[in-house]
Design a protein with these regions (language model features):
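N-terminal intrinsically disordered, cationic/polar leader segments
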Residues: 1-257
Length: 257
C-alpha cells in the first residue's frame, strides 16, 4: 500500500509565519467547575496555534482529538493544562484556547423566595506566548437599568430597560464566575430573575425606581468595585442599555489600567 501524502507537513516557500491557525466554533459538551459546583454545558470552542514560516499547514485533526480526551471539569487549572497540551501536540511555541458557554445560576425571587435559573454568557481564554501562560475571564451579566433623567423630569414613572454589562479581566489569583456576577448585579438598578410572582414584580419595579443609573454610572460603579479587588490586575467593563424609548442602544466602556 502506498504511503498517504502528508501535505500540511510539507515545507512552504513564502517565508511567512502565521500568528494563529486552527479551528473555531467547535460545539462540544463540557463540564464547568465553578464555586457553586459542576455544571454540564455545551461550549463553543476556538483552538489556535502559531505556525512557523517553514511549515505549509497545521494538523487540524489534532485539535478535535485533544478535546475528545478531555474528561475533567474545566476551570483555569485544567484550561492551563489543556492549552499546554495543545501547544505541545501541535509542535508550536504559542497557542490559544477560548471556551464560551451559557452559565446558569439558581436565584431566589426577592419577596416570594421562589427559585429559578438565570443564564449568563461566559468565556474562559487560556493563552501561551513563547512559554508564558495567561488566562482571561469574560462574563456578560444581564441587568435592569432605569434612567435618572426620566425619573427626574416625569411626574410619575421612568423609562427602564434590560442592559448587558460585560466584564473581561485578568487576575493574579482565582476569581470565580459567581463573584463577577455579584459585582455587576450589586451595581445595577435591579438584578434580573427567571421567575417572579406579583409581590416580586412590585419589588423589582420599585427597587429600580429607587436606584436609577445612567449607562455611565453603571460602568463607573462596576469599575470601582473591580479596582477594589486586589486580585484583579486589569479589566474592561462595558455596558449596553437596550433603550426602551429609542431604537438604538446607549453604550459605555472603561478599560483599566
Amino acid at each position: 500500500m502506498n504511503a498517504i501524502a502528508d501535505v500540511q507537513s510539507s515545507p512552504d516557500q513564502r517565508n511567512m509565519p502565521i500568528n494563529q491557525v486552527g479551528i473555531k466554533d467547535l460545539h462540544f459538551p463540557l463540564q464547568i467547575q465553578s464555586a457553586e459546583g459542576v455544571q454540564h454545558t455545551i461550549a463553543r470552542i476556538g483552538m489556535t496555534v502559531a505556525l512557523p514560516a517553514s511549515q505549509k499547514g497545521t494538523h487540524m485533526s489534532r485539535f478535535v482529538a485533544l478535546m475528545e480526551k478531555q474528561t475533567d471539569a474545566l476551570d483555569f487549572d485544567t484550561l492551563h493544562k489543556l492549552t499546554a497540551d495543545m501547544v505541545a501536540l501541535l509542535d508550536s511555541h504559542s497557542g490559544k484556547i477560548s471556551v464560551s458557554f451559557p452559565f446558569f445560576r439558581k436565584k431566589s425571587a426577592p419577596v416570594s423566595g421562589i427559585q429559578s435559573l438565570l443564564d449568563y454568557d461566559v468565556t474562559l481564554t487560556g493563552e501561551i506566548k513563547n512559554g508564558t501562560y495567561s488566562h482571561n475571564l469574560k462574563v456578560m451579566v444581564p441587568v435592569t437599568s432605569l434612567c435618572p433623567c426620566s425619573k427626574e423630569i416625569s411626574q410619575y414613572g421612568a423609562h427602564n430597560q434590560r442592559s448587558h454589562v460585560t466584564v473581561s479581566l485578568i487576575a493574579n489569583a482565582d476569581v470565580d464566575i459567581e463573584e463577577i456576577i455579584d459585582y455587576v448585579e450589586a451595581q445595577a438598578s435591579c438584578q434580573l430573575y427567571g421567575l417572579l410572582k406579583r409581590p416580586d414584580e412590585k419589588y423589582v419595579t420599585e427597587k429600580a425606581y429607587e436606584n436609577p443609573k445612567f449607562v455611565e454610572d453603571m460602568v463607573r460603579d462596576v469599575a470601582t468595585a473591580l479596582i477594589a479587588d486586589k486580585r484583579i490586575e486589569s479589566f474592561v467593563v462595558e455596558s449596553e442599555n437596550f433603550e426602551s424609548i429609542h431604537n438604538h442602544s446607549a453604550y459605555a466602556y472603561i478599560a483599566y489600567p
